[in-house]
Amino acid sequence: MTLWIEWLQTVRYLRPACSRSRTFFWMVLTLMGFCCRADNAGVTSFVRVLNFRGEAYHRFLHLFHSKGVDLDMLTACWVRLCLTLFRPFQVGQRLVCLADGIKAPKEGKRMPAVKYLHQQSASNSKPEYIMGHSLQAISLLVHGSGGQVAAVPLTSRIHEGLVFSNRDARTLLDKLVALLFSVAVVWDRKVLLIADAYYASGNIIRPLLAKGHHLVTRAKSNAVAFLPVPDV
């Protein structure tokens, strides 16, 4: 019971993201379901682990597309709370963030944002093309209780398969930069971003440097060097 009291004291800081107390109540129950469930059966696992009746199933579903939850405000509350709950790993005065993309296979025929995706890192266990969601995520590097470092997820968004405007010509790199800036502006701190070689691009580096942030990554192998032709 002591653990749940501490848990609730933490979750209450997310209250500004909900327009009504009832909406916040169902969000708390949803978070409880995520923390306690023993299987990955979706909303059904929430109903099962919380010992609710079947009527609660649709209540949980309504929360995920409810206008009573402000996603941007919820993300800002969580990003701000992470600096209180955890001891962030720093390089100088900079917070260290990790960024990566993931393609999650989905089989739902009518599931929103599912599209035909190409996986650059195909292997024997990963097909080259899949149907699924393409997401990009940012985490905060923190000190663990045992002296190790851990990554705390901050935010994640589906960046392919959703078209809000035909005039939106942003690439995945541009969308990741915007996602990072939405996190950094909440902290009002400079960030050191660590990412793989896919993000070693001018579209990432230039906006970061303009805002005072930095990128640590592996250089791509597509650079070309040459010597001038000697005079004969």
What are these regions (language model features)?
Residues 161-232:
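An internal, acidic/charged active-site-proximal segment
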Residues 1-26, 34, 143-162, 168-173, ...:
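A short, flexible helix-boundary coil/loop motif
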Residues 37, 103-105, 197-201:
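Gly/Ser/Thr-rich loops at beta-strand to alpha-helix junctions
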Residues 1-65, 71-78:
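Gly/serine-rich nucleotide phosphate-binding loop at the start of the catalytic core
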Residues 96-99, 153-157, 192-196:
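Extended hydrophobic secondary-structure segments that form protein cores and membrane-embedded regions
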Residues 66-148:
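Active-site-proximal, Lys/Arg-enriched surface segment
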